[in-house]
């Protein structure tokens, strides 16, 4: 029987030919698809939100201010125009984001935001699951109160 390590070959430092200003965020959202189960158009909108957030974070250090600017009507309009969707369709997508926990308290759910060094040179991904119960998909938030 062949050793399993011979079957799986992973480069220790894979080089991705993309930048945070390019398609990186679209690939990131696609990578996280099992967690959010968004449609292609919804993933495009989320990727654009993440890209704009990253670019804003280069100049705005305060995260509360960053989130306020990101969720401002002007920024949303720019994202909608970049994605080429109508205002009505954009509102439907935003409602779904809120319902499914992608946006919580007018902020993008922190676990969906990639942790990128300020110079954009390094992205760290760390998965740690002790049991199956810790692997929670995004979805409607359930209240902890009993009726």
Language-model regions, residue ranges each:
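Positively charged, structured surface patches that bind polyanionic biopolymers
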Residues: 1-37
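Eukaryotic partner-binding/assembly regions in large regulatory complexes
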Residues: 1-12, 113, 117-126
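Short helix->loop/beta-hairpin flanking segments within DNA-binding domains
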Residues: 38-74
